[in-house]
Amino acid sequence: MSEQKPVQWASKIGFVMAAAGSAIGLGAIWKFPYVAGTNGGGAFFLIFVLFTILLGYPLLVGEFIFGRRNQTNAIDAYKKEAPRSAWFLTGWIGVAACFLVLSFYSVIGGWILLYIVKTASGSLSGLSQAQYGALFASIIQNPVQTLAAQLVFMALTVLVVARGVQKGIERVSAVMMPILFLLFILLVLRSLTLNGAMEGVKFLLVPHFGDLTPESILFALGQAFFTLTLGVSVMVTYSSYLPKTQNIPRSAASIVLMNIIVTLLAGLAIFPAVFSFGFQPNEGPTLLFTVLPAVFEQLPFGTLFFIGFLVAFLFAALTSAFSMVEIIVATIGKGDEKKRKKLSWTSGLLIFLVGIPCCLSYGVLSDVHLFGKTFFDIADFTVSNVLMPSGALLISLFIPLKISKSELLAEMRNGSNAGKAFFYTWFYLLRFIVPLAIIIVFLNLIGILSF
């Protein structure tokens, strides 16, 4: 029996698009606008960019090197580098995090789908902001609608992953990502033509460091790691499909740049319009579902532009979801592509079932609390405050401790001409600065360190 040919990306740009799609998820569009809006706007954005470049980029390069070097799923990669040790549990942390993330991430994906349908049908027209708020509450409290939408979102995700890395994830990401960028550019151009739009631009881009607090700086630090899908071995899995000719430092830089650009475009699409019509930029997570519909309502062809925004939002959610299912399939399937379809659908079904309590947290289970939190909040807290930071810390410690500098340099130079100055700057950032930053974020998230 002939051995299966190892799975690889069909092209260099295909990998970049898929990895960027994984990184550019709801964090850049769903979370950043309201976090920036409540933490000083331009000052927060500047700090976020600096942290992304100085801390997120080194860890992303490290995950790429580690993944490509071992050419296998994350758990087996740890076992190859550190046999007969417990380091492989770091890979399982990533698998557990992705499974749990998607259990509530798919709920938000379902909300987006419902909003697209309702906007296209005209159900979201002619309402005030208060009415949009009431409508959003009624939507997320409806168990039948939200569960059906969550199921559709998971089905769309699994349909792509089941087709494989090249024919599924890469091909679809290569279509969705350019469309996402194009939609955001059109939305930004429209938003910037509004009266008073420059107030929103100033809010986003002009730093007011007096508005920064230690808490908001830590927020920016956390955003720099988590918006790149770091710490959950997704990038280790994706890079395991890379050929040795791929320029890792350049690919990582492209992904970081694309993530920053989309974050900037999301801000420029939202804040000028919000300021133009006198709304508050610090409305919280409901900004996208209650404030923006009211803003677009007042624009010529506003419904069309809002649908464009929702489609971009959906594409960002889906391309991230692909990577989360892929790490589960890669781990359990161990490279056996014959098992891919079955594993994809089984994983998707289990994620949906685990996500049911999260989906119902705003409806029939809204009064059910554990440790003072709903099921949705527990899943979010566990991933954001425990699994992702601990996974990122362990990966940042593992790579420079368990792989020699000479081996890391040799792997980095496969496909690139990275000099020693670049390498040693990257290495010492990864070995010392990145773990320290993650520890600070982690201690703050669990309440041990506060300012």
From Swiss-Prot:
Cross-referenced CDD domains: SLC6sbd_Tyt1-Like
Q: How does it sit in the membrane?
A: Multi-pass membrane protein
Location in the cell reads:
Cell membrane
- Which Pfam family, just one, is annotated for this protein? SNF
Q: What is its main location?
A: membrane
According to the UniProt entry, its GO molecular function terms are: symporter activity
Task: Please list every transmembrane segment annotated in the UniProt record, as residue ranges.
Answer: 13-33, 41-61, 97-117, 142-162, 174-194, 217-237, 255-275, 299-319, 345-365, 381-401, 429-449
SUPFAM superfamilies recorded: SNF-like
InterPro entries assigned to the protein according to its UniProt record, in alphabetical order: Na/ntran_symport (IPR000175), SNS_sf (IPR037272), YocR/YhdH-like (IPR047218)
**GO cellular component, as recorded:** plasma membrane
Keyword Transmembrane helix attached? yes
Q: Which domain of life is it from?
A: Bacteria
Keyword annotations: Cell membrane, Membrane, Symport, Transmembrane, Transmembrane helix, Transport
Q: Does the keyword Transport apply?
A: yes
What protein family is recorded?
Answer: Belongs to the sodium:neurotransmitter symporter (SNF) (TC 2.A.22) family.
Q: What does this protein do?
A: Putative sodium-dependent transporter.
> What is this protein's name?
Uncharacterized sodium-dependent transporter YhdH
Gene designation per UniProt: yhdH
